[in-house]
């Protein structure tokens, strides 16, 4: 039987192994456990600082700040990328420093923790331009917050004010969050919110916002001033969460008017967008829209009419993706193709992708309707999968 050659790397001193890892890009360094058996334990030491901390929730801010400020990618003793905190024997906080200035912060709560309550959250981002940027420490530009609750949202807010270069924010799984205000007039460029089922009110003060991703029930949204999104995702298959039929959604329609990429549910077009632009139907168009992702619960003739009605507002559309999800909320509004746009021809539409269609008949009806509004000289590539 052939003898295995000795694992040379495993024989190296710990300090030298840590030194080697410190010069590797994060995505490469995380694969080192596959290289050597000893690297498995070395990798854990290189990225993880575990704290058994029995202080208060307010102490989280100080611990995380020290962790961030002490980070040095090229110093083996300071190249730790994960911090774990145990607070009050019931709260667990995980902070990960990822490549490209991304910080993930997740909260976990045991069954014995204090009862979570519904909460309103105002999150301010310091818009002052720093006079000088300290080259030491970890510079947070993208912050991902997971499962913030009524007990921790204030300490998170105080931490965010310290991130002077923050321009991207992701908030997810805040299950008791009912009202959220994002206040960043000049800094924030990217905002993503998902998995917040109780959210009823969203206020955005961010004049420079370029991308917005929202997943969940559509809340009442208040827009301050005007900003132009280049990409907007409204994955609101669960329908609306507001109860005000007089919702003023006009400012929201204006923010997505110049989007290049848009994800939309049919019901949102029928109940929200179309009523808000009814007075300017002849002139309102999504001039810059190149990619549309359309979500519906089925595709009968009325729903095809609704889609065609929207497409006629998009003269520059190039790519169309249609997803049928039977669990999607359905609007009861009646929509007909507007006569003012009856002669519109889509000259740039090249690709149509269909997903979730249950029958060939539905698919063929839609393709026929699309051919009616596509330029006769324009080849159309249709990709489809039957559910």
Curated annotation (Swiss-Prot):
One Pfam family from the record: LRR_At1g61320_AtMIF1
Transmembrane segments: none
Domain of life: Eukaryota
Residue span, F-box domain: 6-52
Protein name, per record: F-box protein At2g39490
